């Protein structure tokens, strides 16, 4: 009984319909419906960003339950869309962007334009050293004469001096600044040298001073010699002033 009932149950048309309804027809499993194909191709031209979800939904709607492989088949079947072909037609865009990122300072290495001839910077921010100004002998003589008159110049004076010497105002200003700094250094060095020489002279005078003359010796025993010597060194000014005795005699007479 069991052997005969099993084939009958398998060969029954109801069971076959259930199996085919569960898995679907083989043609629909292998390729999506033509309606979903047309819908995907038309929608891909308008909105490329939403083409893949619409294709997945349209292909999955023809089945009893959603499967993973119809989405893959729909994408692979429409690989020749205009959007994908346009992306694949520019393979060098990524390399071009990478080369630009690797070399960001190619355009910034150019030096900037000089403004006023005072400050110049290149693309990296480093200051470019300007060429040193070479003054002629006549210009140096005129500048030195003016520096002896005054160490600071007003704007009109500086402009006039620069025009007369054929220089710019910036060159004249820088020359006066350098000259003032050198002059201050020389003054400091000269003051230190004068102080050192004064100290050296004081030490030499204290070490090599002459001895005290014998007339000024307080321990001398001879009064005449000391008096004579004292008279020779200190003149007597008693004749210029009246003595105390004469003043005392004149006071009662005035009374």
Swiss-Prot record:
DNA-binding region: 128-187
Family classification: Belongs to the distal-less homeobox family.
Region: Disordered, residue numbers: 1-38, 95-118, 204-230
Keywords: Activator, Developmental protein, Differentiation, DNA-binding, Homeobox, Nucleus, Repressor, Transcription, Transcription regulation
Annotated PROSITE patterns: HOMEOBOX_1, HOMEOBOX_2
Protein's name according to its UniProt entry: Homeobox protein DLX-1
Primary location: nucleus
Top-level taxonomic group: Eukaryota
Its biological purpose: Plays a role as a transcriptional activator or repressor. Inhibits several cytokine signaling pathways, such as TGFB1, activin-A/INHBA and BMP4 by interfering with the transcriptional stimulatory activity of transcription factors, such as MSX2, FAST2, SMAD2 and SMAD3 during hematopoietic cell differentiation. Plays a role in terminal differentiation of interneurons, such as amacrine and bipolar cells in the developing retina. Likely to play a regulatory role in the development of the ventral forebrain.
UniProt organism field: Homo sapiens
Tissues of expression: Expressed in hematopoietic cell lines.
Cited SUPFAM superfamilies: Homeodomain-like (SSF46689)
Pfam family, one: Homeodomain
GO MF annotation, one: DNA-binding transcription factor activity, RNA polymerase II-specific
GO BP: cell differentiation; cellular response to BMP stimulus; cellular response to transforming growth factor beta stimulus; cerebral cortex GABAergic interneuron fate commitment; embryonic skeletal system development; hippocampus development; negative regulation of BMP signaling pathway; negative regulation of cellular response to transforming growth factor beta stimulus
Biased composition, class Polar residues, residue ranges: 1-14
Record's compositionally biased regions (Low complexity): 25-36
Comment, domains: The homeobox DNA-binding domain is necessary for its nuclear localization, transcriptional and erythroid differentiation activities.
Subcellular location per the Swiss-Prot or TrEMBL entry: Nucleus
């Amino acid at each position: 009984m069991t052997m005969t009932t099993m084939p009958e149950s398998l060969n029954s048309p109801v069971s076959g319909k259930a199996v085919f309804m569960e898995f679907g027809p083989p043609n629909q499993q292998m390729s999506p419906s033509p309606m979903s194909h047309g819908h995907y191709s038309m929608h891909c031209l308008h909105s490329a960003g939403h083409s893949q979800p619409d294709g997945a939904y349209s292909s999955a709607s023809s089945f009893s339950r959603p499967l993973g492989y119809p989405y893959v088949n729909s994408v692979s079947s429409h690989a020749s869309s205009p959007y994908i072909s346009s992306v694949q037609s520019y393979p060098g865009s990524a390399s071009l962007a990478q080369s630009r990122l690797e070399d960001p300072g190619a355009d910034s290495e150019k030096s900037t334009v000089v403004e006023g001839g005072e400050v110049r910077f290149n693309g990296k921010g480093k200051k470019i050293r300007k060429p040193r100004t070479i003054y002629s002998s006549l210009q140096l003589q005129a500048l030195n004469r003016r520096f002896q008159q005054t160490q600071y110049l007003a704007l009109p004076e500086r402009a006039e001096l620069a025009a007369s010497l054929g220089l710019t105002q910036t060159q004249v200003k820088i020359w006066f600044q350098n000259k003032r700094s050198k002059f201050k250094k020389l003054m400091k060095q000269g003051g230190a040298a004068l102080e050192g020489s004064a100290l050296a002279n004081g030490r030499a005078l204290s070490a090599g001073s002459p001895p005290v003359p014998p007339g000024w010796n307080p321990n001398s025993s001879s009064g005449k010699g000391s008096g004579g010597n004292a008279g020779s060194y200190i003149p007597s000014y008693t004749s210029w002033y009246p003595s105390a005795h004469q003043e005392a005699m004149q006071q009662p007479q005035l009374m």
